[in-house]
Regions:
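Extracytoplasmic small-molecule ligand-binding "clamshell" domains
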Residues: 19-100, 138
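Bilobed "Venus flytrap"/periplasmic-binding protein-like clamshell domains
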Residues: 46-59, 121-153, 159, 164, ...
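Short helices/loops that flank or line small-molecule/ion binding pockets
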Residues: 59-64, 71, 76-89, 106, ...
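Extended ligand-binding regions for polar small-molecule ligands
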Residues: 54-63, 212-246
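Acidic, polar ligand-binding/catalytic clefts
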Residues: 71-133, 142-145, 201-204
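Ligand-binding clefts/hinges and TM-proximal coupling segments of bilobed small-molecule sensing domains
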Residues: 67, 147-159, 194-196, 230-254
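Periplasmic-binding protein-like
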Residues: 28-29, 113-117, 191-228, 248-254
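A ligand-binding cleft/hinge motif common to bilobed small-molecule-binding domains
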Residues: 83, 94-103, 175-206
Length: 254
């Protein structure tokens, strides 16, 4: 009975996607080792798009024989398009859960979990919890800091990760608050440039990332169910871990 129900759900998902699924990628900041690319044109980005999360999501779509088109745009625009019944985006990933996002989209089971923290210069390793009003906490525009439980909001927000790293190295930021793994991933892949070494500090908190599907997409739930099935199967079989290990292995201890 459960097998027949699954076949029905998959069939419904196929029927709902007579047109190619519009898959959107936020293109202001790469997110290595999970999602990254090279080049500046849409074609260059599409041809070089890779990463551990990207691999799993696109594998899931291909397994269900779902045709898709890639669209690159700023992350804020991706979220705006997902709110629209006739928007340009049907699906994205590397999305953290927010209550307001859940009003217009469905979230998959967790695709991966990463650690939250902040970066300092080794010679200026201040404790964030001892920040004074004159100290500068830097962040990136559009990033979700809800789960960080910060003692205060970033006082200076930059337009990109590289800009935030630059400000930290110029000592115009005392701390750069961020997810840990994507920063080291970008550095190791040569996507972020450093003139001075930086040091990470864990906040003892983690953050889950998901596939995000537009609620108003016809038969969005069957599509979500098929994605969840693939993700859970990949995780239980060890395939997901093998994919993540292949792209980058980041140490979990300082």
């Amino acid at each position: 009975m459960r097998f027949m129900l699954l076949l029905m759900l998959v069939g419904m998902a196929h029927g709902a996607l007579a047109n190619p699924l519009r898959v959107c990628v936020g293109d202001v900041n790469v997110w290595p080792p999970f999602t990254y690319w090279q080049g500046s044109s849409a074609q260059e980005k599409a041809e070089s798009l890779t990463g551990s999360a990207t691999t799993l999501v696109l594998e899931a779509l291909k397994k269900q024989e779902i045709e898709y088109q890639l669209h690159f745009m700023p992350w804020a625009r991706v979220q705006h398009e997902l709110t629209q019944a006739t928007g340009r985006c049907d699906l994205t990933w590397d999305a953290s859960y927010r209550a307001e996002r859940a009003e217009y989209s469905y979230f998959s089971v967790p695709l991966y979990t990463i650690q939250l923290g902040y970066f300092t210069l080794p010679e200026n390793s201040k404790d964030l919890n001892l920040a004074t009003d004159s100290d500068v906490l830097c962040g990136v525009n559009g990033f979700n800091y809800q789960n960080f439980a910060l003692p205060r909001e970033p006082s200076l927000t930059l337009n990109s990760v590289q800009q935030a790293l630059n400000m930290l190295q110029k000592e115009r930021c005392d701390w750069f608050v961020s997810e840990i793994e994507p920063i080291y991933g970008g550095i190791m892949l040569g996507l972020y440039q450093l003139d001075r070494p930086i040091q990470h500090h864990f906040l003892g908190k983690t953050k889950e990332y998901h596939v995000q599907v537009r609620r108003s997409l016809p038969n969005a739930m069957p599509l979500l169910n098929s994605l969840n099935e693939y993700i859970l199967q990949a995780q239980s079989s060890g395939h997901a871990q093998a994919v993540f290990d292949r792209f980058l292995s980041i140490t979990q201890t300082e």
